[in-house]
Amino acid sequence: SFDRPNIRYTVVAKDDSRRQLLAFLEEHRGQAGIVYCLSRRKVDATAAMLAERGVRALPYHAGLDADVRSEHQRRFLREDGVVMVATIA
């Protein structure tokens, strides 16, 4: 069903993407979410930057080992407040 009241999709014009992302995540501290990036490299860099700032962020893309992807997906589904950083593909 498309009726998913627990999911919110937001599009915001990009100005200073890093600052905007950090501010958004701070407003929603402790909540789960997905951040989409255009490349695997950007996924890895964004997940690392967020983790350095205390966000429970995990990368997720086809370039990761299948076991790592599976573990990150499991954590996202079972743990509170995990932010998945993924490619759009």
Residue ranges and their predicted role:
Residues 1-89:
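Helicase motor core with emphasis on the C-terminal RecA-like subdomain
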